[in-house]
Amino acid sequence: GILDTFIPKEWAEANGTTPDAVDGYLALQTLNKVFEYNCTGSKVYDNCWDFVAEDTHALFMDIDSEVVGKNFLYMLTEDKYAAMLKDAFNALPADEQAYFQPTIDEMESEANDLGLGADGKYALAWIKLWVGSYNAQTDDGPICNTLVSDSATDQCGLLVYSKLRSVEESAGVSVNNIKVAAYQDGYKGIGGYGYCHYLFVTDNSPLPWTACAFIAYMTCTEDGFSAWGKDMGGYSANPEVAAAIEETYQHSKGGYNEAGEDQFPCKDDRGYDWWTTD
């Protein structure tokens, strides 16, 4: 191919391995897209099936606009995530289960034909309902701007978490007009998804060692990663850099004001480990 993978020695060591033993590509960072909902009304989204419920149209970057959105849906068919969807379904009240059950039953033969696991029908049902109901948008920025408005009562979306960093508080706009669904006590099911940014060296690079040095700078030093790390929702794939970034920027208390009060709780970034563990 035209892209080569370079694994910096320090990056590999920080991850408890060696460059030769790394199987895959060099990740710069993981970003996450999370379910959020406007909380100016009385509607609560406490289960991932709520985002595909009747008459719900979540704001979402169209799957033909960004490949990671399509990949997210494919990932849901993996046994681990299909089981999470099944468990979330089982936690629903009976009347809500009754709405989804026909679609789940309809997808059983499809799941078998595709060779999916025992819970594959739950994944396919969620995917079908999502694709058939979401409100397609061109970018996550406008989605965020819509949801934080006090006129977006009960609306919801799946969008890049870090977009909350740029919300400017005003009379009709506030970060406190939304909630991050997975941060709420008792939430069931998937809270969103993560995706990586990878770094490569091109085969035709006139200065490949310079490219490698720059890659090492971005992935192995706090200063090099700070272009992304200064903002919430971007997690370095180097655990040493990630720890240094948190020490400097304190994203876990991103919603705190100068008086030490938690003014915007949804901006308290819980971090990579929280998002990637059950």
Name each model-derived stretch.
Residues 48, 143-146, 211, 224:
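Short, hydrophobic alpha-helical packing/hinge segments within bilobed ligand-binding/sensory domains
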Residues 122-124, 132-204:
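Extracytoplasmic/periplasmic substrate-binding proteins
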Residues 1, 52, 270-278:
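Short, intrinsically disordered, charge-balanced linker/junction segments flanking boundaries
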Residues 2, 56-57, 77-81, 132, ...:
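Sec-exported extracytoplasmic/periplasmic mature domains
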Residues 33, 40-43, 64-69, 161-165, ...:
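Solvent-exposed loop/turn segments at secondary-structure junctions
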Residues 197-275:
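Mature extracytoplasmic/periplasmic domains
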Residues 1-142:
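Extracytoplasmic ligand-binding site segments that recognize negatively charged/polar headgroups
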Residues 29-31, 72, 194-197, 210:
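Residues that flank catalytic or metal-binding motifs in active/ligand-binding sites
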